[in-house]
Amino acid sequence: MTNLRKTYPIIKIINQPFIDLPAPSNILAWWNFGSLLGMCLMIQIITGLFLAMHYTPDTSTAFSSVAHICREVNYGWLIRNLHANGASVFFMCLYLHIGRGIYYGSYLYKETWNIGVILLLMTMMTALINYVLPWGQMSFWGATVITNLLSAIPYIGTTLVEWIWGGFSVDKATLTRFFAFHFILPFIITAMVIVHLLFLHETGSNNPSGINPDSDKIPFHPYYTIKDALGLALMLLILLLLALFSPDMLSDPDNFSPANPLNTPQHIKPEWYFLFAYAILRSIPNKLGGVLALLASILILFMMPLLHTSKQRSLTFRPISQTLFWILVANLITLTWIGGQPVEQPFIIIGQVASISYFLLIIILMPLAGLFENYMLEPKW
């Protein structure tokens, strides 16, 4: 059986990345999130496929087709709740995965990191267009506001927005094309995940110490397959608790009303996982400036390898950088809270301070802390 595992073409493809892969012996539970994200993607594709069988992408029937799925389709309520809350769990895992990458210096595997950031952007785009599909109040107005941001682009902005809408407002054409994109993007993401893994397995996994682990490696199976299975069980438990006990906890109440172009909701806001970026967008009074800041808040991740100044890879033995990292985490939580609040004082000024400190921490303070820690390792006095 050993020889078959290593020689048979199809089994060999599975064997190399999941069974005989040499993995560092000291990686923590923080390294589980890659496999959890793969599982989340599978759950989203499967539940999404079943939802697509019953959903109709038409402005007159979209809202009622979602109600029909929940009321009349066998276990439709469960499929919809798993899909809606699966997106939230997906983003929880995604942000923890990125946080781990920053903390342990995994961004120094540049190709793997850059493909990961592209995956983040594609996942955000998929989740953004999904918001339109139920055709509730927040779907319609969220789509109108978010797509309208493109009108800030000089000269071609207005034309570009109307081209995306397929008309002069968010309407049937917009809903149809957004459904088509929402259906195809997860499969493109799956292909990109394979490329992400290919580049990761070229270098091997990083580890908490940030030191080359080649001298001490163990096979991925059974050690890390068991460890991943535990993480998977916990993730499924959280997802099922959300989907079965409080399925609407993370939804917006406005989305339970059908879309009405004549009635604007009191507060237009995206899903919770975009609130930090939305807060950065709102904190700048100028429209173009806000859009650029929004883009910069995500695209800044591409700069992480360039901003690494420390002689050490990981933050494990760097207390000053650790402190700044946790301040950054607190800052992002503050931005998420601000994004869900109305645009009034004191929320405006808190959002502006948090937005400035977000960029300040990543671009200036963390690289300076790395240089200072280098100096402290070899003081000149």
Curated annotation (Swiss-Prot):
Q: From which organism does this entry originate?
A: Phascolarctos cinereus (Koala)
Positions with a binding annotation for heme b b562: 83, 182
Q: How does it assemble?
A: The cytochrome bc1 complex contains 11 subunits: 3 respiratory subunits (MT-CYB, CYC1 and UQCRFS1), 2 core proteins (UQCRC1 and UQCRC2) and 6 low-molecular weight proteins (UQCRH/QCR6, UQCRB/QCR7, UQCRQ/QCR8, UQCR10/QCR9, UQCR11/QCR10 and a cleavage product of UQCRFS1). This cytochrome bc1 complex then forms a dimer.
A GO biological process of this protein is:
mitochondrial electron transport, ubiquinol to cytochrome c
Question: Which family is this protein grouped under?
Answer: Belongs to the cytochrome b family.
Sorted keywords for this record are:
Electron transport, Heme, Iron, Membrane, Metal-binding, Mitochondrion, Mitochondrion inner membrane, Respiratory chain, Transmembrane, Transmembrane helix, Transport, Ubiquinone
Where does this polypeptide localize? Mitochondrion inner membrane
Q: Tell me how this protein sits in the membrane.
A: Multi-pass membrane protein
Membrane-crossing ranges are: 33-53, 77-98, 113-133, 178-198, 226-246, 288-308, 320-340, 347-367
Signal peptide residue numbers:
none
Instruction: Check the record and name the PROSITE patterns matching this protein.
Output: CYTB_CTER, CYTB_NTER
Superkingdom as given in the UniProt entry = Eukaryota
Tell me, what is one Gene Ontology molecular-function annotation carried by this entry?
ubiquinol-cytochrome-c reductase activity
Instruction: Give the protein name, as stated in the record.
Output: Cytochrome b
Residue sites binding heme b b566 per the record: 97, 196
Q: Which Gene Ontology CC terms are recorded?
A: mitochondrial inner membrane; respiratory chain complex III
Any further remark recorded for this protein: Heme 1 (or BL or b562) is low-potential and absorbs at about 562 nm, and heme 2 (or BH or b566) is high-potential and absorbs at about 566 nm.
Cofactor: binding comment: Binds 2 heme b groups non-covalently.
| Residues that coordinate or bind a ubiquinone | 201
Spell out the Pfam families in the cross-references.
Answer: Cytochrom_B_C, Cytochrome_B
Function of the protein: Component of the ubiquinol-cytochrome c reductase complex (complex III or cytochrome b-c1 complex) that is part of the mitochondrial respiratory chain. The b-c1 complex mediates electron transfer from ubiquinol to cytochrome c. Contributes to the generation of a proton gradient across the mitochondrial membrane that is then used for ATP synthesis.
Q: Needs which cofactor? A: heme b
InterPro entries associated with the record: Cyt_b/b6_C, Cyt_b/b6_C_sf, Cyt_b/b6_N, Cytb/b6-like_sf, Cytochrome_b, Cytochrome_b_C_euk/bac, Cytochrome_b_N_euk/bac, Di-haem_cyt_TM
